């Protein structure tokens, strides 16, 4: 039985949170905040165990037929993806529980803000307005449904084995994050959510242009085919630069960092604790996978620029963190600085530097996640 369950381990880990997110909404609405919390926690815990069990093998992969146009839909958990995948789901699982008291307080605040004034009938009796309990139940249902979709978007991005699949997960991760900031952030939440959406979306579109250039040149979007193919020299550098810029926005590296302090400062704390420790580091993972692994020659040519960019990001983030008076913004700028270390490690073209960058992601995810809690 266990073996049969493990056959589709990664498929379950990625798609169960997406498929069961409507159920989280229904449970929240019908049975309340606590039930929705425990349901989300239990589901993510199960998925985390699947990911950890699958990572025991050196390389674990699953492939499924998809459209012929885009190649194969695959999920790959290897030595590079495993630390990222495990950290993302461990953090999501813990934060599902941490959300319970924090978001309950937030929903109560929102109810006071948004509670409609009682409407009076012509005879002077008040019509019943929405009760606090109903309001909290509805809000927690929506919150946990979005939380689950956000979690699976991050994991899917790390496990993808195909450029189009990577891009789809990349966007799936962005939309719930935008809604979570827009619904429950601190004011002016809508403007900050739009700014976050605009910045990260523009980054994603630039990334897609790089993907299309490579995919159309090779004739396949599958990582395995790209790895073996000779990409024509005239598109190599422009495609690599487009991918690096697109990922630089996700990394919040210097020059593309503007959105992070705002999104971080406004987002509800459990979401800030995912944005900074888990989500922005996915940009570094993608640099490893897409630039270091697939375009080694271009990577060697551009590495000096990555190093300079990394050092600039490191010092800028650190200096700006010292000037903030809001603790969440301090964390945001310190995260920008940490991403500079990752870029610096990736730019070093040495095994130690690359291993150090991956270790940095794990320690940053753990440390920053704990700081927020």
Name what the model sees in each region.
Residues 2-9, 19-145, 220-228:
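Transmembrane helix-loop-helix hairpins at membrane boundaries of multipass inner-membrane proteins
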Residues 171:
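Short phosphate-coordinating micro-motif centered on Lys-Gly-acidic
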Residues 9-14, 84, 304-307:
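Alpha-helical transmembrane segments of polytopic membrane proteins
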Residues 15-31, 176-187:
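Cytoplasmic juxtamembrane interface segments
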Residues 94-97, 103-104, 131, 135, ...:
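Hydrophobic transmembrane alpha-helices and their helix-loop junctions in integral membrane proteins
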């Amino acid at each position: 039985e266990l073996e049969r369950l493990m056959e589709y381990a990664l498929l379950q880990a990625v798609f169960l949170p997406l498929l069961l997110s409507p159920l989280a909404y229904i449970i929240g609405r019908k049975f309340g905040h606590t039930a929705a919390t425990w349901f989300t926690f239990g589901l993510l815990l199960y998925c985390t165990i699947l990911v950890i069990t699958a990572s025991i093998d050196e390389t674990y992969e699953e492939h499924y037929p998809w459209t012929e146009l885009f190649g194969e839909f695959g999920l790959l958990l290897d030595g590079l993806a495993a630390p990222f995948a495990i950290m993302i789901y461990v953090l999501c699982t813990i934060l599902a529980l941490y959300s319970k008291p924090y978001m309950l307080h937030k929903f109560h605040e929102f109810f006071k803000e948004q509670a409609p004034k009682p409407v009076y009938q012509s005879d002077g009796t008040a019509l019943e307005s929405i009760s606090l309990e109903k309001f909290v139940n509805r809000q927690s249902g929506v919150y946990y449904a979005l939380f689950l979709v956000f979690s699976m978007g991050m994991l899917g991005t790390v496990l993808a084995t195909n450029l189009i699949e990577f891009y789809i997960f990349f966007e799936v991760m962005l939309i719930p994050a935008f809604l979570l900031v827009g619904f429950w952030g601190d004011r002016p939440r809508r403007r900050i959510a739009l700014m976050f959406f605009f910045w990260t979306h523009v980054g994603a579109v630039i990334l897609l242009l790089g993907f299309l250039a490579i995919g159309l040149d090779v004739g396949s979007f599958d990582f395995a085919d790209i790895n073996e193919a000779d990409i024509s020299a005239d598109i190599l550098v422009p495609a690599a630069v487009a991918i690096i810029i697109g990922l630089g926005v996700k990394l919040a590296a210097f020059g593309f960092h503007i959105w992070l302090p705002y999104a971080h400062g406004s987002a509800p704390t459990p979401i800030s604790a995912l944005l900074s420790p888990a989500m922005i580091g996915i940009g570094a993972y993608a640099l490893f996978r897409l630039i270091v692994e697939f375009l080694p020659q271009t990577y060697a040519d551009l590495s000096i620029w990555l190093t300079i960019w990394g050092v600039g990001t490191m010092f800028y983030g650190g200096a700006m963190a010292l000037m903030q008076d809001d603790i969440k913004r301090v964390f945001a700028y310190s995260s920008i600085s940490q991403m500079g270390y990752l870029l610096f490690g990736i730019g070093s073209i040495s095994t130690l530097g690359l291993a150090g960058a991956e270790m940095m992601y794990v320690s940053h995810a753990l440390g920053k996640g704990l700081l927020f809690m």
